Amino acid sequence: MKPPILIAILATVMTGTMIVMLSSHWLLIWIGFEMNMLAIIPILMKKFNPRAMEASTKYFLTQATASMLLMMGVTINLLYSGQWMISKVSNPAASTMMTIALTMKLGLSPFHFWVPEVTQGISLSSGMILLTWQKIAPMSVLYQISPSINTDLMTLVALASVLVGGWGGLNQTQLRKIMAYSSIAHMGWMAAIIIYNPTMMFLNLSLYILMTLSTFMLFMLSASTTTLSLSHTWNKIPLIASTILTLMLSLGGLPPLSGFIPKWMIIQELTKNDMIVVPTLMAITALLNLYFYMRLTYSTALTMFPSANNMKMKWQFEHTKKMTLLPPLIITSTMLLPIMPMMSILD
């Protein structure tokens, strides 16, 4: 794809998301979603092959169905309240339909089936956009309608998503599928807290985006798409191998890394709201995620793939690509725990 065309398409994707985030009128929100969806399709099909075509078609059909459900919910709400404003969601049926539409857009369970398939069929750079930027618009709408969301429905969706995100990634060897299931699990944690503390959900989303961006950039730098290709990283870029180890542990939510902050705060907030069973189940299920992150850590940093002696010095002769954004992203993805005391403003 030519650079001017790519810039124009990326600008449209960003504009669509910004329209959704800054609008309080349902029609403008719907227009923003449509702009964003139609502009992302060429990015997903950047590598023009049957697999990318299939992934783009799946993405388009899912998002179009979700947009239709969203407009149906908006129309029902309009009939009952006579208002187009996002703050005036008063009808329970309309609220439920909107919630289902937005969970479908985010890829939360039970509407998660498209996420691993689409992510696996596209390039690493497209997958990075799909699993980070594309989550912002639906989450911002959920944030705005959070007072009217059905608590039981959202809790059930959150628990199912955390379970599916952990269970689905267990036997995967494809890195993009692992990141897709990781995304489903993280979205589940955000869905659990959105009713009780929507601001905390945005903190979680920010940290998730930072960690996922860093991970995808490292995969692109080492040109890895499977756990087997990741095991060659020691020979090519030793520093990257140790960085991937730290990032995986951060994604798993282990202290003293940044990924521990949202899990800690969400469990604390849910406990304050007299919900003991839900955070307990989520914390136990998060061990499944930690297991497959540890598998990646083991294959990347703790084993050396059998190779000839001259291959072990390969890193000395390889010219590595410059990624200026990577160092600050890695630092924020792993070392933010000291700012934890400042988070008291979210209470």
From Swiss-Prot:
GO terms for molecular function: NADH dehydrogenase (ubiquinone) activity. One of its GO terms (biological process) is mitochondrial electron transport, NADH to ubiquinone. Its EC number is 7.1.1.2. It comes from Vulpes vulpes. Pfam families: NADH_dehy_S2_C, Proton_antipo_M. The keyword Metal-binding does not apply. It is an enzyme of class 7 (translocase). The keyword Nuclease does not apply. The chain crosses the membrane at residues 3-23, 25-45, 66-86, 111-131, 149-169, 178-198, 201-221, 237-257, 274-294, 325-345. Core subunit of the mitochondrial membrane respiratory chain NADH dehydrogenase (Complex I) which catalyzes electron transfer from NADH through the respiratory chain, using ubiquinone as an electron acceptor. Essential for the catalytic activity and assembly of complex I. Belongs to the complex I subunit 2 family. This is NADH-ubiquinone oxidoreductase chain 2. It is a multi-pass membrane protein. It catalyses: a ubiquinone + NADH + 5 H(+)(in) = a ubiquinol + NAD(+) + 4 H(+)(out). PANTHER family: NADH-UBIQUINONE OXIDOREDUCTASE CHAIN 2 (PTHR46552:SF1). It is found in: Mitochondrion inner membrane. One of its GO terms (cellular component) is mitochondrial inner membrane. Keywords: Electron transport, Membrane, Mitochondrion, Mitochondrion inner membrane, NAD, Respiratory chain, Translocase, Transmembrane, Transmembrane helix, Transport, Ubiquinone. Core subunit of respiratory chain NADH dehydrogenase (Complex I) which is composed of 45 different subunits. Interacts with TMEM242.
